[in-house]
């Protein structure tokens, strides 16, 4: 009869790596542990920080799916979290309004009221028009 520990280890008592694969089996298959190998070469998923480094070193010119992951700013982090929670981007022609801006608009409306928000909106439109 095997103990619970032996069942979890596979019952053969051989050495196992963190994924539960027998090291002897991996060595025989030619996929043994190499201290200098990258996580992908060892058959593991890279950690998120390593993934960020790999994404930032992507010089092929391909667009990165989530540019907020690279930004690391408060705006980017809040926006990424809001999108993950289910908020969507609003599209106005070629302009995109991010969820952070929509939430900011509603908070400003709540604090300042409609007249002050209208004044701020007109000022923003004038600034955008002057910059073009």
Curated annotation (Swiss-Prot):
Domain of life: Eukaryota
Membrane topology: Single-pass membrane protein
GO CC annotation terms, alphabetical: Golgi apparatus; intracellular membrane-bounded organelle; membrane
Spans through the membrane: 100-120
Spans annotated as Disordered: 1-68
One Pfam family in the UniProt entry: DUF4605
Subcellular location: Membrane
Main location: membrane
Key words of the record: Membrane, Transmembrane, Transmembrane helix
Entry similarity comment: Belongs to the FAM241 family.
Name under which the protein is recorded: Uncharacterized protein FAM241A
Gene: FAM241A
